[in-house]
Amino acid sequence: MPSVRSGTAPVLALVAAWLLLASAIGPVALGSDSATAAPESGDDPIVVDADLPTDGPTVEAVVRLEEADIPAEIGADETEQRLETHAESTQEPLLEYARGSDGLQVEETFWLTNAVLLEVDTDAVDYEAFDRFGAVEAVHENVEVSVPERPDRVNATASGAAALAGSERRTTTGLAQVNATDVWDAYDTRGEGVRVAVLDTGVDTGHPDIDLATDDPSDPTYPGGWAEFDATGGRVPGSTPHDTGTHGTHVSGTVAGGATTGTAIGVAPEAELLHGLVLTDTNGSFAQVVAGMEWAVRQDADAISLSLGATGKHAPFIDPVRNARDSGAVVVGATGNDGPETSGSPGNVYETISVGAVDRNGAVPSFSSGQRIDRTEWTAAPPDWTAPPSYVVPDVVAPGVAVTSAAPGGGYRSMPGTSMAAPHVSGTAALLLSIEPNATPDEITTAVTETARMPAAGIVAGDTTTADGTATLETRYGHGIVDAKAAADALVAARRSSDDAVAGNASDSDPREGARSPSSPVFVAGVLVAVSLTLAVLARYRIGRR
């Protein structure tokens, strides 16, 4: 057998050493970028909303740009930062073009979803003109949103004592139905340390049961706890808390109201209440809601409560909801008051905890919206949306008939609607986060939905009963009626189990992936072996050359 030349042997030995290292640790990614290059943007034509007018007066158009690619493993704070940085960099060419063009006016920019609101003179500018920008993906209308239409007449009372009179309980029926006080007693918490942002018609801070958060009690604008947004999503400077209707004060009271009458009205009365005015009386816009959500995320809101929406499936709400959730906020939304086989956005977005209504007996009222949603029914949904092919809304139901809460002017009011149900769930989320501050939105959602209970057999649910209406029950109740105590117990147990698993073993990840980490013992050992072999070969080679 021919011998290997002495000059080649060291090289082969070195190659063998480093191949040994490579086989031990596998491929290692260099840097934080994906190994696969992202496709060039702008390959596909932009999607123009068919509802956008193409002639006549100026039109408010929302121009949507490519969303940031946020790795799942990064934290909430870094997610927010990356969203803002990405929006700023990708929007600049469009903004420069709009500011220098006749027929275009920049009204607002957004980062929670990568979007710019423009006023467009359709006689001077075609929507297709935006296709010149590779980052632009779609153009759609500034969708109108509103408070879900009230299902029946609302009875108001001027006196809190009168509104709550006759009750032998020290909580409203709704709090008892979701077992809020059981959480108070078992876990010694009423929502302390948790921030809930209600986005609605405003709030009356003069109400004795409403305590709005503020960074400066001497400042009448309630900095950090209050914000008002106009129809374009612009922050209204110098705004002080007020309610343009009655809806926002009522919803806020159910989330975190007090008990000055002796009867508690709020699920999480010690939670920090934030309020963003995004509806004037009952109506608002997509831009207002997104601006309010951005503000809530910036204020480190742990939960965002949305008792509003637009009937139908409106894909523009998908990215704001999932980005808010990725930024650490639980998003809760009402399904609407249009009855079976209907729902509204953003409540019907998969990442929202969608909430329908029940009465005090556990029956779903006829007005409560719910349906099975096929993903293909969403027009222009994000291609990377992870919603399943089919899912049901609501996720859960909560008290939404004759719900008593605060009313502007210091009184109390009984109101129906899924708008009243949603804040019961937002308050429940606050209780859970007070117990487990590090719980993720996914963990909160799982705890709330998987512990919800169905009513006893025979309870009327729309046109069916629990005894024989399984298909209808699914779209009327979702997982069932929210049970705050059961959800708290499940969350605590799940996190304890997770902590025990981490402490007693290792992660659930593929051990081969851990071996490829530059900080892993396998990686370090492999490097040391390769370096040692290299040094030994070089030393021997030098000796042989002497």
Model-identified regions with their sequence ranges:
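Loop/turn elements at helix/coil->beta-strand transitions in domains of secreted/extracellular proteins
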Residues: 58, 192-195, 269-274, 299-304, ...
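C-terminal subdomain of the subtilisin-like protease fold in secreted/lumenal serine endopeptidases
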Residues: 303-305, 352, 434-515
